[in-house]
Each structure stands twice: as C-alpha cells, then as structure tokens.
Design a protein with these regions (language model features):
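Viral structural modules
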Residues: 1-373
C-alpha cells in the first residue's frame, strides 16, 4: 500500500440474545478499502469482522423482545507499513427493551361509582432482527473490454414493501449498487445494478389490520469479477445480505378506570401508573430532503460516484431525525483519485406535539448537482 484513498467501516446488528439481565448484541462490521499500490495501480479490498456487545437490561424474567439499531460513530485508520493497516471504528448501539407487564384494575362493583375513559392504544406485538441473502451475476463491459480492477462500490438498501398478514409479516428489500472499475484499456467505467430479496417472518398476533415498521441495512457485501461463457472477465458477482430490524404493532381500543368511589364499603384506594402508547398517528408518505456537502479544501474535476446509506432514523419531539452516511469518489484537478466520507443530518417535522414513536424510514432514490463555490 502506497497511499490509502478510502477506508470506511459500516456496522449492522444481526442478532441479539437476552440472559441474566444482559442483552448480548452481535453483528457485522464491513470495512471497504481503496488504495494505491506501490506500482501505481488503484486497488480495492473488502473485509468483514464480527462484533459483540453486552448491554445491561435488568428486566429479569419479564423480558419479551428488543429493538436494536447500530450506526457508525467514527472510523480512523493508520498505515503502519506497506503491508499492514490499522483500522479503528466506533459504533453506537441503540436499544429499546420490552418486558411483559400485567396490571389489574376494577371493572365492575355493585355500589361503586367508576370513572372510565376510552383510549386508543398501540400494542407492540413483536420486534426483532433477521437477514436476507442475495447472490447474483451481472454482465458489464459496455465497450467489449474486460474488467481489470475494481475501484469503488457504492450501495444503499431500500424497503420496497412491508405487508401484514395473518400471523406473519412479508418484507421485500432492494439494494441499489454502483460499481466503478478500470477496464483492460485503462479507462474508468461505471455500472449500476439492482438486487432484490424478500422474507416472511412469523409474528404471533399479527393480523391484516396490524402495522409493521422496518429498517434495512446492507450487512455484508462482496463484489468480484467472474468470467462469462467466453471466459472473458465481463461479469460481476454480487453477494451479500440485508440486515432488517422490524417492529409489529396493533391498534386496540382500551377502557381504563381512572377513579372510583365506593361509599358503602370500607375500601382502600390503590393507584398506579401504566405506560401506554396512546392515540397513535401514522405517516405513510415520501418526502424530498436536500443537504449541502462541502468540499472546502478540494477542487473536484470529476465525480466518479456518490453513494448514500441510511445510518439511523428516529422520532423525537415530533421530528423525524435522520442520519445519512455519504461517500464520494472523485478526481481532483491534478488527476488524483480521492474519496470523501461523512455523515449529514436531516430532520422533518411530523407533528406539533412532543411525540415519539417507531420508524420505518428508508432512502428511495437520490440525485446530486455539482456546484462551484
């Protein structure tokens, strides 16, 4: 390795296990590397590492399920020598643990006066994680040339459909990929592909009237050139896996007793607090958001590829907060191949109230315009 052009690390949670008051989270870390070799060639490599994290969750035997999301906090690297690169990356793991809870209330009593209130509540049925694998081959080589070197691969994942059916949930995923490579004539070419995958998950209590929320990330991705029927390197094999986190919920009508009077009895009043997801609102819409990416110290001559990936989406105080990671591969004015990676944060107002909720947000498509300063 003579010079590192790009080193980026992304994380995805693949599974969790609860035991003895601790939530054990496991996942994959995907490292993508683009570098210049000592011979002046631009090369790329991809690596995968497994990670585990133990999180205290003292809910004892009442544990039901958990929502788990992971996003990249930072990635640093250090070139130790021409054959060894040290990569350090941090991730944030966001968890929400659900526990089974039983509450009793007085519903009817002779001689008692009850004050009752009707409430529409969101009952969480299940939350979890699963993976969808994909492995496809695509023909490339628009100018009848073979693939020489892969330079850069950009990809983002999309939830195409989430459908609730009796006792099950159908999730359809899609990945949009762009591969930049150099052919045998030393010309740089770019090709884009789409891969699909789907899975049916068992969810107890799920009906067609239920609501499902899902987010997807690319957990693993490997791209390599393979020979076609003429033994020419004009095909790409793309293999990997989607990591999907989901939440299933059902709207139910609940009757609550908020106060009671029993004058004819020697009664002791007991009150308590019950957490409820009341008066749910649902938003099914597509919005266009824009962000400015600044390259203050760089003059861009040509953009080879720009890739985006959803890092995190959550609802807080009536706002949809989104973090999107970006990667830009470009040539500077000196003809050097460069890359820039970062995270941009966007928000969208949903309601005027201070509400929270579950999110099934995804990136459908994007475009960009190169503007001069």
């Amino acid at each position: 390795v003579e010079r590192v052009v790009r080193c980026v690390c992304s994380h995805a949670v693949t599974d969790y296990e609860y035991a003895s008051g601790s939530l054990r989270v496991t996942g994959r870390s995907r490292i993508s590397l683009v570098y210049i070799s000592t011979s002046g060639c631009c090369l790329s490599a991809a690596f995968e590492e497994r990670f585990t994290k133990n999180i205290d969750a003292p809910v004892t035997d009442a544990f039901a399920f958990a929502q788990v999301h992971a996003c990249t906090d930072f990635t640093n690297y250090r070139l130790i020598n021409q054959r060894k690169l040290e990569v350090r990356s941090g991730l944030q793991v966001h968890t929400e643990v659900f526990a089974y809870m039983e509450q009793s209330q007085l519903t009817d009593c002779c001689g008692a006066i009850l004050r009752q209130a009707d409430a529409q509540c969101l009952e969480v049925l299940d939350a979890g994680l699963f993976s969808c694998d994909f492995d496809e081959k695509f023909a490339v080589g628009q100018h009848n040339t073979n693939i020489s070197v892969l330079i850069h691969t950009g990809a983002f994942a999309v939830i195409d459909e989430v459908r609730a059916i009796a006792g099950k949930m159908l999730v359809k995923c899609r990945a949009e990929l762009c591969v930049v490579y150099e052919n045998t004539e030393h010309n740089t070419e770019k090709c884009c592909f789409t891969v699909h995958s789907s899975k049916i998950v068992d969810v107890a209590g799920m009906t067609e009237d239920s609501h499902a929320f899902a987010q997807v990330k690319i957990g693993s991705l490997f791209v390599k050139p393979v020979p076609d029927e003429n033994n020419d390197l004009r095909r790409l094999e793309i293999a990997g896996a989607f990591c999907v986190s989901y939440t299933a919920a059902l709207v139910s009508d609940t009757q609550l007793v908020t106060d009671a009077y029993a004058i004819a009895y020697d009664a002791r009043v007991q009150t308590g607090t019950v957490p409820l997801l009341r008066d749910p609102q649902f938003f099914y819409d597509g919005k266009t958001l824009s962000a400015d990416l600044s390259f203050e110290d760089t003059e861009i001559a040509e953009i080879l590829d720009l890739s985006l990936a959803m890092q995190e989406a959550r609802v807080q105080n009536g706002l949809l907060l989104v973090e999107v990671g970006y990667g830009v591969a470009y040539y500077d004015v000196s003809g050097n191949l460069c890359c820039k990676d970062g995270v941009t944060r966007l928000q969208l107002a949903l309601t005027d109230g201070k509400c929270a909720g579950f999110v099934g947000a995804g990136l459908q498509s994007f475009d960009y315009i190169l503007q001069s300063a």
